[in-house]
Amino acid sequence: MKIAVINGGTRSGGNTDVLAEKAVQGFDAEHIYLQKYPIQPIEDLRHAQGGFRPVQDDYDSIIERILQCHILIFATPIYWFGMSGTLKLFIDRWSQTLRDPRFPDFKQQMSVKQAYVIAVGGDNPKIKGLPLIQQFEHIFHFMGMSFKGYVLGEGNRPGDILRDHQALSAASRLLKRSDAI
């Protein structure tokens, strides 16, 4: 089973990275650090004559990579009680891909994937991060994806996540449950 960690963090080696690494320890996983790729915001042309136009950025290459994977882990810091703008920008572009003739089976291809979420925040994330988890539930439901689990960790400054033993333990078990892989 191929695994991709789609990381929306913007701090290299930050708390989100640490928790995501813990989750895939012992597995062969591809890490896609979205901040390293130029991705343009969506220009909503769903109802315009001619529809969406091709965009010259790295988005399509990332889509091609994740379509090859069976398990997708969406990792993000919790910024202002939601996912990072970097990750949101990537997911927003799915609206374009759903209508892109180069990806005619995008929704169907995504529907067979197992999805997980890892999120880290500094302001009571195990409560205040729940609306973010619900947002991902809706995203995955719309795409027909199987939402298998999540971990919410607490950390603000670099390295803080190492004190959240509950989150570290949950991350280490995330893919090891009997219904995963």
Curated annotation (Swiss-Prot):
The keyword Oxidoreductase applies. One of its GO terms (molecular function) is oxidoreductase activity. Belongs to the SsuE family. It holds the Pfam family FMN_red. Keywords: Flavoprotein, FMN, NAD, NADP, Oxidoreductase. PANTHER family: NAD(P)H-DEPENDENT FMN-CONTAINING OXIDOREDUCTASE YWQN-RELATED (PTHR43278:SF4). This is Putative NAD(P)H-dependent FMN-containing oxidoreductase YwqN. Its cofactor is FMN. SUPFAM superfamilies: Flavoproteins. Its EC number is 1.-.-.-. It comes from Bacillus subtilis (strain 168). Putative NADPH-dependent oxidoreductase.
